[in-house]
A protein has these predicted regions:
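Active-site environment of divalent metal-dependent phosphoester hydrolases
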Residues: 15-17, 43-45, 69-76, 131, ...
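N-terminal active-site segment of His-dependent metallophosphoesterases
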Residues: 1-58, 71
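Divalent metal-coordination and catalytic microenvironments
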Residues: 11, 40, 67-68, 105, ...
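Active-site-proximal beta-strand elements of phosphoester/diester hydrolases
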Residues: 5-13, 121-127, 246-247
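Residue-level marker for buried hydrophobic side chains located in beta-strands
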Residues: 8, 37, 64-65, 122, ...
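Acidic, His/Gly-rich catalytic cores of divalent-metal-dependent hydrolytic chemistry
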Residues: 138-286
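A short acidic-Thr-Gly-centered motif at the start of a beta-strand
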Residues: 1-2, 27, 55-57, 112-117, ...
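Active-site neighborhood of divalent metal-dependent phosphoester bond hydrolases
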Residues: 49-52, 56-176
């Protein structure tokens, strides 16, 4: 008899065929197994509508994080942002079940922290600021999640975008506070050693601007004692370091859609990586 399995999956970005093939490869059973998805469920891939419908049908078997593309969908749907040239969101926006899909999306998380067979894992889409603990990260994510599920959603989306403030300060309040939280959890790649973020550079770790470094290399990072799992950074690719799992392997760019099984891991041994090849749907930006 097969036992329950827990899987962590990287950025799907609307590639439903790849998701279906990955679920078949792991013999996923929604009545038995559980998925944790690291955000960017939609956009740029050919069928984000099918992705949302599939994940929504899975109910409690799928725990989804929100990425920057998922928040972009909400902003476009509420008339806050124009669609971008390479967006593939029309199917969702024109679907009869648009209201239920968007309502479901607003119920998803920005951070998850749990223990899997003795391993504490913090899941985010993009990154964590060095001053934040895992527990604090989940609490701060909860502040944004409450807004996404409340009556002030549209107003929040109108003010969510922007690069400032670029650093965390516990005294921040209002939209400045919420914007820093969103930017860290859904957009962060590089920061200064003391946690000042920048968003112009999207390449690999070697493209860090002077004075900046990958967020996970910040000295004194307070989540260094837990495993942080994240997506978002396709130029980074699959990365497994002590207490670090990067799972955006560029599915939409013709890379792979990746999963690891969490419940069969052995402490201090590599996780087993499971992948399916993806068809390129977009050309990577240079």
């Amino acid at each position: 008899m097969n036992t329950m399995a827990l899987y962590l999956i990287g950025d799907i970005q609307g590639c439903d065929n790849a998701l279906q093939r990955l679920l078949e490869k792991i013999s996923f059973s929604p009545s038995r197994d559980t998925l944790y998805l690291l955000g960017d469920l939609v956009n740029r891939g050919p069928d984000p509508l099918a992705v949302l419908r599939r994940l929504m049908r899975l109910g409690a078997s799928a725990h989804c994080l929100l990425g920057n593309h998922d928040l972009h969908l909400l902003a476009v749907a509420h008339g806050v942002r124009p669609a971008h040239q390479h967006d593939t969101l029309d199917g969702i926006l024109q679907s009869a079940d648009r209201p239920s899909l968007l309502a479901w999306l607003c119920q998803q998380r920005l951070a998850i922290f749990d223990n899997f067979r003795g391993e504490d894992i913090l899941m985010v889409h993009a990154g964590v600021l060095p001053a934040w603990t895992a527990t604090q990260t989940v609490a701060l994510a909860g502040e944004v999640e409450a807004i996404l599920r409340g009556p002030d959603l549209a107003d929040f989306l109108h003010h969510m975008y922007g690069n400032e403030p670029s650093a965390w300060d516990g005294s921040l309040h209002g939209i400045d506070r919420l914007r820093v939280i969103v930017n860290a959890l859904t957009r962060l790649r590089f920061c200064t050693p003391d946690g000042r973020m920048e968003f112009k550079h999207h390449g690999g770790v070697e493209t860090a601007p002077p004075g900046y470094l990958p967020w996970f290399d910040a000295p004194g990072r307070r989540t260094a004692d837990v495993t942080v799992a994240f997506g978002h950074w396709s130029r980074l690719g699959w990365l497994e370091h002590p207490h670090l799992l990067a799972l955006d392997t560029g599915c939409v760019w013709g890379g792979h859609l990746s999963a690891i099984r969490l419940d069969d891991s052995v402490p201090n041994r590599p996780h087993h990586l499971i992948q399916v090849q993806c068809e390129a749907c977009q050309t990577p930006e240079i």
